[in-house]
Every structure is written in C-alpha cells, then in structure tokens.
C-alpha cells in the first residue's frame, strides 16, 4: 500500500534526522554549516520520477566519506536505474523528501562519470557502509541497492537496504525499529 510506505519512510527520515539510533534523545547540532559538494542528478532513468523538480542532488562516494570523517550530516541513497527495487524506492523517497522539505544526496551506483564497481570507490563505500551491510548465508557482505543512509554528526544513525514496498511486508515491529 503506497500510503503505508510513505508513512513508514516519513517516520524513518524524521526519526533518523532528529534522533538517530542512539538511546539519547538529544537533537543533533544541525546549526553548524556542513557543505556537501553536489552536482545536478540525472534522474531520467527512473521511470516514475519527474526528471526535474525532484528532491535528489548528486554527490560522490568521496563526499559521503568526508561527511562521516568530518562530522557532517545528511540523508544519502545509493541507487541505480537498472534495479527494480530502486525504481520503486526513488519514487517514494522523493515523495517523502518533498513532504519534509529535505534534499537527499544521490550516489549513482552505475555512473560512468563517478564509477564505483571495480574501482577504489567501491572499497571506500564498502568501508564506510560496512556496519550497515548484512551478511549473506556465507558470512560475506555485499553492497546492495537501494540503500538509504542517514548520517548525523558523522555517524551512521540509520539505514535501510532494499525494499519491502508491498506494505503488508512491514510489521508493527519493523515500523517501531525505524
């Protein structure tokens, strides 16, 4: 159900940005200026997303790492147009971001301009996101898309990998964890 998914993403983004995943209920210091280098994100490959007027700004793996290293903050998504779950996720993320009035930093997992697979960028991304990547049945960790990550004060305060966009796949327990 589309409405349930929007509610779940809204709750996730609001909670992650305001509180993170710590037990402390302190609000992060978002007053300090932290500028992330961005570029105009080409979202034309996402079928259900307007190519202009969306809430995504392009950024790079090095900017994600700098955000962590320098104590910055932001909501990032690692996605690619050839991924069905990514197609669905980007539409919902955009709607939630519009409602909240926030921009989401988009890292294109299949970019020619900023390649990831088979490059040093993959190693950097893997290192930064390591704790958020679940182990497979062989005990190995592989990057997956889509992955949404919220960073507050340089710490990953929450993440969501993949989708359960059927709505009925989310339980009350899942929502309360967000």
Where are these regions (language model features)?
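Positively charged n-region of N-terminal signal peptides that target proteins for export
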Residues: 1-8
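C-terminal motif of bacterial Sec signal peptides marking the signal peptidase cleavage site
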Residues: 17-20
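N-terminal leader/targeting and pre-domain segments
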Residues: 25-72, 178
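Short active-site neighborhood of thiol/selenol oxidoreductases, capturing the structured segment around
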Residues: 69-81, 93
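The canonical Cys-X-X-Cys-His
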Residues: 83-87, 148
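Typically the conserved alpha-helix immediately C-terminal to a functionally engaged Cys/Sec
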Residues: 87-100
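Thioredoxin-like thiol-disulfide oxidoreductase module
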Residues: 109-156
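Non-catalytic, surface beta->alpha helical segment in thiol-disulfide oxidoreductase systems
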Residues: 141-178
């Amino acid at each position: 159900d589309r409405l349930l998914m929007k509610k779940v993403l809204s709750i996730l983004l609001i909670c992650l940005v305001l509180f993170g995943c710590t037990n402390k209920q302190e609000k992060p210091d978002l007053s300090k200026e932290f500028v992330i280098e961005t570029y105009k994100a080409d979202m034309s490959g996402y079928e259900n997303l307007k190519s202009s007027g969306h809430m995504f700004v392009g950024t790079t793996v090095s900017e994600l790492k700098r955000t962590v290293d320098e104590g910055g903050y932001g909501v990032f998504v690692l996605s690619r147009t050839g991924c069905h779950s990514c197609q669905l996720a980007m539409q919902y993320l955009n709607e939630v971001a519009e409602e909240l009035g926030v921009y989401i930093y988009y890292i294109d997992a299949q970019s020619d301009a900023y390649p990831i697979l088979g490059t040093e960028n993959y190693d950097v991304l893997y290192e930064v996101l390591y704790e958020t990547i679940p182990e497979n049945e062989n005990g190995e960790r592989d990057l997956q898309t889509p992955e949404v990550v919220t960073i507050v004060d340089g710490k990953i305060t929450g993440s969501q990998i993949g989708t359960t966009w059927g709505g009925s796949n989310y339980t009350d327990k899942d929502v309360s964890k967000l």
